[in-house]
From Swiss-Prot:
Function: Protein-glutamine deamidase effector that inhibits the host cell cycle and other key cellular processes such as the actin network and programmed-cell death. Acts by mediating the side chain deamidation of 'Gln-40' of host NEDD8, converting it to glutamate, thereby abolishing the activity of cullin-RING-based E3 ubiquitin-protein ligase complexes (CRL complexes). Inactivation of CRL complexes prevents ubiquitination and subsequent degradation of the cyclin-dependent kinase inhibitors CDKN1A/p21 and CDKN1B/p27, leading to G1 and G2 cell cycle arrests in host cells.
Enzyme Commission (EC) number: 3.5.1.44
Keywords for the protein's UniProt record, in alphabetical order: Host nucleus, Hydrolase, Secreted, Toxin, Virulence
Lineage: Bacteria, Pseudomonadati, Pseudomonadota, Gammaproteobacteria, Enterobacterales
GO biological process: symbiont-mediated perturbation of host cell cycle progression
Name of the molecule in the record: Protein-glutamine deamidase Cif
Positions annotated as active site in the UniProt record: 117, 173, 193
Catalytic activity entry: L-glutaminyl-[protein] + H2O = L-glutamyl-[protein] + NH4(+)
Gene (UniProt): cif
Organism of derivation: Yersinia pseudotuberculosis serotype O:3 (strain YPIII)
InterPro entries associated with the record: Cif (IPR032278)
Amino acid sequence: MKISPNTISPSQSDPRMSTNVSQRSRVSGIGVPVSHSINNPSIQHVQDFATLSARSLRANVLLNSDDHSVPIHAKNPSELLEAIDNNISQTAQDWGVSIQEVEVILGSSKRIIEPVCGVTANTIMKLFLDNDIFSYSFEKGQSLSLSQLQERLASLPAHKNFILRVNDGGLGHAYVIDFPATTNPSRDAFLYQSDLGEGVTREVRFEDWMTQKASHPISLDDINTHFIGIAQDQIDLAHIAKLFDVDGNVKMLRADHLISHKTSEFNFQLFEYDLKNLENNMSIIKTHCN
């Protein structure tokens, strides 16, 4: 694997289990920052959800829910929280230990949980795509190879919106890229992610990424440069930092965590989305969680 630390170009694996916990659990008085981007109206909705899920237990359980058979807007946060409590109580009984000991391992319905990257990516996809007749599931999504994706990206209709979920084997990371409709000759994209900091890149909370970095556009060329570099083991750390580090700081990367990559280790799922559907899902979620 060849690594280039200084090439400058503009701005994380399948879902894994984790019990990393955030202490922020305020439910009321949520103030959502205004997006810095005027090119992408969907950013504000994802920011709203990230902020809500960082402060409301009811929204946080939606973020962490792994039941993909049910559309996100149809999930009942109270039922999900009750199911967690019942599972913890039953597990404590089965193991012969206290509820508190189980919560250390499995988490708690009474604390904000920051999910692994793959769970965040799946929930973002559901936020964009779920409706009354469709519920996104990563396991059932149609996957594209890198060459197939590049063909699709080269011919995306400019007047339509697209969302891309990426499993990036080189970084050991999953993330989502938003391609909003545009009237500009060049198409901007926007990256959404969370990261527990267990791989190449450092920890970043979903809310922090959405409020600090997500509204900074990246180009199709920048995205392709990263994909090709990973696939060919031509690693540009500065490019990775600019895309995936909240401050673009290459010194925060751990190059020793890079995985020697084969193209087949990428997993791409590309969908067209309707902005009104995203707006509707967020409106329902806010009603359920406020």
